């Protein structure tokens, strides 16, 4: 089967990119590819028999027209000016059989006009982390870009140490970022901002294209998608680590996996990025940062969208966020209805978990085993202050009894939303260290495990992290 690629971005937004081809690595070789995603995209298996080929930027498929996009943004709350694809190249937009499209973005593709002081390269460590994280998020049901392939090479890349150069192909319906709009707004080119909005609506919100109120309705949906995404991050315990405006997806996807981390101990102020000295992107600050980023996007639209309409959309953010968050947390607690005491019970559990530094994922998974008429719980042994747990647990069981639902039905629901497995940093690190020594077994094994995060397991993937694996420092260097 021949893959079909189109050139909408190249044809319709000529001032937003520089056309150029990837710069191949030395002795590049394919070490992993996403078979399930490849099947979804109808990619022939024969394409993966090459050592590198398109996966390593050595060849292009018919119809591909590679380019690097320009955008700007606020980084850590400060205007950073022009940024852009400093090491990534959009290879092409695949047209699928159902009429939708999928961007193919090659990360680590070499120098571009937007590389600034960088070398245009990515390292094996960061490509493995992104592949694992994006697939983990996908199987958790959270909107995200996805990873299609990884190549490693003999090309040295200099970071804190010398690391092997690598490339990753990331796919997504679109790579439109808040930063695309900021770029032209701050260049005082509002018509180009409008062109970006029209492009987005035409291709991703086509049902609004002929509506005279299309810009307001479109921005309302961008706000809602962002609020929903952040609610999902918070419920699963995911910290992004670098929520700059250029890393915010217009479609509400999790984009740009850098110094991310899933909670081990429940620590509301968890900071996963060791460069975030002020804690701007701490776990508990993510909802506020996302709203701040939406405000920056709204500002770019103000030349052609009424400010009152923009503010109304922004004002809806918190309620949408709380609605999604509340629904998901009630499911995690096994509540089938909404009662006035629910928030208090949840907050009391969080307070107890924070005091005891309880493991976030394990706590909710073990809570899924609760029998509403039994005071016995395997979770009790996870707490030092047994009296405090017993008091909370008795009231929790009383709340469960209000719903008049069988234990088996409720447990089934809870186990479908409380994962047994999340991508803890130490699991990724173990796969990385093996891969850097040439052993890809753990990389493939972990990828396979992450496809079933809600299944019970008996291995160390679902155990408490070892002491060395807690609070691993992760930086933006990749």
From Swiss-Prot:
The keyword Nuclease does not apply. Mg(2+) binds at residues 247, 256. It holds the Pfam family SelO. ATP binds at residues 84, 86-87, 107, 119-120, 170, 177, 256. Its cofactor is Mg(2+); Mn(2+). The active site is at residue 246. Keywords: ATP-binding, Magnesium, Manganese, Metal-binding, Nucleotide-binding, Nucleotidyltransferase, Transferase. Its EC number is 2.7.7.-, 2.7.7.108. It catalyses: L-seryl-[protein] + ATP = 3-O-(5'-adenylyl)-L-seryl-[protein] + diphosphate; L-threonyl-[protein] + ATP = 3-O-(5'-adenylyl)-L-threonyl-[protein] + diphosphate; L-tyrosyl-[protein] + ATP = O-(5'-adenylyl)-L-tyrosyl-[protein] + diphosphate; L-histidyl-[protein] + UTP = N(tele)-(5'-uridylyl)-L-histidyl-[protein] + diphosphate. GO terms for molecular function: AMPylase activity; ATP binding; magnesium ion binding. InterPro entries: adnlytase_SelO, SelO. Belongs to the SELO family. HAMAP family: YdiU_SelO. Nucleotidyltransferase involved in the post-translational modification of proteins. It can catalyze the addition of adenosine monophosphate (AMP) or uridine monophosphate (UMP) to a protein, resulting in modifications known as AMPylation and UMPylation. This is Protein nucleotidyltransferase YdiU. It comes from Escherichia coli (strain SE11). The gene is ydiU.
């Amino acid at each position: 089967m021949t893959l079909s690629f189109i050139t909408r971005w190249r044809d319709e937004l000529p001032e937003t990119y520089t056309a150029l081809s990837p710069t191949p690595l030395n002795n590049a070789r394919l070490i992993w590819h996403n078979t399930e995603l490849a099947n979804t995209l109808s990619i022939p298996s024969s394409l993966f028999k090459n050592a590198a080929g398109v996966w390593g930027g050595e060849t292009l498929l018919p119809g591909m027209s590679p380019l690097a996009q320009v955008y700007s943004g606020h980084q850590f709350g400060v205007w950073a000016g022009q940024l852009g694809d400093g090491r990534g190249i959009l290879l092409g937009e695949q047209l699928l059989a159902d009429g939708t499209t999928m961007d193919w973005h090659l990360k680590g593709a070499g120098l571009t006009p937007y590389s600034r002081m960088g070398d245009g390269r990515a390292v094996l460590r960061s490509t493995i982390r992104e592949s694992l994280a994006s697939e983990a998020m996908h199987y958790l049901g959270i909107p995200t870009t996805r990873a299609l392939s990884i190549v490693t090479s003999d090309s040295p890349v200099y970071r804190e140490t010398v690391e092997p150069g690598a490339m990753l192909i990331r796919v997504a319906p679109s790579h439109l970022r808040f930063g695309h709009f900021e770029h032209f707004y701050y260049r005082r080119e509002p018509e180009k901002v409008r062109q970006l909005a029209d492009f987005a609506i035409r291709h991703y919100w086509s049902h609004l294209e002929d509506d005279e109120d299309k810009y307001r309705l479109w921005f309302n949906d961008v706000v809602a998608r962002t609020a929903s995404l952040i609610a999902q991050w918070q419920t699963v315990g995911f910290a992004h680590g670098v929520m700059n405006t250029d890393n915010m997806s217009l479609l509400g996807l999790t984009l740009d996996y850098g110094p991310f981390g899933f909670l081990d101990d429940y620590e509301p102020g968890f900071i996963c990025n060791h460069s975030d000295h002020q804690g701007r992107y701490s776990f508990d600050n993510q909802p506020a940062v996302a709203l701040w980023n939406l405000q920056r996007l709204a500002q770019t639209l103000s030349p052609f969208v009424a400010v009152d309409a923009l503010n109304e959309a922004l004002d809806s953010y918190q309620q949408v966020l709380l609605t999604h968050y509340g629904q998901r947390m009630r499911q995690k607690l096994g509540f089938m209805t909404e009662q006035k005491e629910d928030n208090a019970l949840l907050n009391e559990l969080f307070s107890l978990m924070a005091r005891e530094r309880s493991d976030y994922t394990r706590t909710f998974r073990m809570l899924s085993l609760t029998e509403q008429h039994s005071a016995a719980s395997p979770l009790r042994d996870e707490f030092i202050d047994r009296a405090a747990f017993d008091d909370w647990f008795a009231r929790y069981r009383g709340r469960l009894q209000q719903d008049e639902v069988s234990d088996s039905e409720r447990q089934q629901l809870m186990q479908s939303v409380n994962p047994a497995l999340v991508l803890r940093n130490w699991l990724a690190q173990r796969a990385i260290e093996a891969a850097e020594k040439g052993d890809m077994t753990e990389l493939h094994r972990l990828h396979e495990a992450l496809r079933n995060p809600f299944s019970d397991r008996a291995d160390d993937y679902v155990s408490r992290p070892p002491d060395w694996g807690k609070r691993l420092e992760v930086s933006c260097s990749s």
